[in-house]
Regions:
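Conserved nucleotide-sugar phosphate-binding/catalytic loop shared by glycosyltransferases and other
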Residues: 3-8, 27-76, 161, 227-229
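Active-site-proximal region of nucleotide-activated glycan assembly enzymes
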Residues: 32, 53, 112-178, 186
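Glycosyltransferases and closely related glycan-assembly transferases
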Residues: 83-96, 104-119, 132-140
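Glycine-rich phosphate-binding loop signature in dinucleotide/nucleotide-binding domains
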Residues: 28, 86-92, 186-188
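Glycine-rich, highly charged phosphate/nucleotide-binding loops
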Residues: 72-87, 176-179, 253-254
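Donor-nucleotide binding loops and adjacent catalytic segments primarily
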Residues: 41, 46, 50, 175-182, ...
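Short amphipathic alpha-helix
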Residues: 13-24
Length: 254
């Protein structure tokens, strides 16, 4: 089986795509899988590391605000449908899978024009515009949350799958675990909470956590607020009299 996976931009779109690809490979080792993305996003790092090839198209996210820049993005995205068609004609996939976001609109629209079956995976509770537009002709729309079903047309063929992930478990001895905790400068005798808002971070999570790390707690926090938020949080903590590199019960990682 030959499969094209459309995934671009953030880890929230790309990692589920990679997890789907890995599952297909585990079930059908002879399958051929390529990704379609842009030349700008995390896909250019994550997809090759996972062992898959990637092709690029010039798709962009389009905002609702009417500006010249937005018009340029729209024109490029419309043109990217033709670029996607060229890739699909060359690769001749049996199935196209979109993981949401602007890339799904371009690639699934191209698949639709070429009469190639496509499915969509939507990880969010609130489906994006691309998912809403392309869901009506999709073979299936797989949902991360059952609530998302009620935001789509009732005629859409949905199935709740949850969000696929690449699970990797480490079997550490107590001594190894304590050593890793020590490397982080934390106390192995206190509970440790991991706070992670995805590759871009999550503003609501960061807002809730930033004051917690200042307090003296009977637990410890490992916090990954996202690269784009790191400097802002560093400044906020500095204003509160805290050095981000030297908070007793917290380790904050970009």
């Amino acid at each position: 089986m030959k499969v094209v996976i459309a995934a671009a931009g953030t880890g929230g779109h790309i990692n589920p795509g990679i997890a789907i690809a890995n599952k297909i490979k585990s079930e059908q080792p002879d399958s051929e899988i390529i990704f379609i993305g842009t030349d700008r996003g995390l896909e250019n790092d994550l997809v090759p590391k996972a062992g898959y090839g990637i092709k690029h198209i010039g798709a962009y996210g389009v905002y609702r605000k009417p500006t010249i820049e937005n018009l340029k993005r729209l024109i490029k995205t419309i043109h990217s449908i033709s670029e996607a068609k060229t890739i699909l004609k060359e690769f001749k996939p049996d199935l196209v899978i979109g993981t949401g976001g602007y890339i799904t609109l371009s690639v699934c629209r191209a698949a639709q024009k070429l009469q190639i079956p496509y499915i969509i995976h939507e990880s969010n509770v609130l489906p994006g515009i691309a998912t809403k537009l392309m869901s009506k002709k999709a073979k299936y729309v797989m949902l991360g949350f059952k609530e998302a079903k009620y935001k789509l047309n009732p005629k859409v063929n949905t199935v709740v799958t949850g969000t696929p992930s690449n699970t990797k478990c480490l079997n550490l001895t107590t001594e190894q675990k304590d050593e890793k905790i020590k490397e982080l400068g934390l106390n192995s005798k206190l509970p440790i909470i991991l706070v992670f808002g995805g590759s871009q971070g999550a503003k609501s999570i960061n807002t809730a956590v930033e004051d917690l790390v200042i307090k003296e707690n009977n637990y410890q926090i490992i916090w990954a607020p996202g690269k784009k938020n790191f400097e802002e949080i560093k400044e906020y903590l500095f204003e509160k009299g805290k050095d981000i590199e030297n908070i007793k019960n917290a380790r904050i990682l970009p």
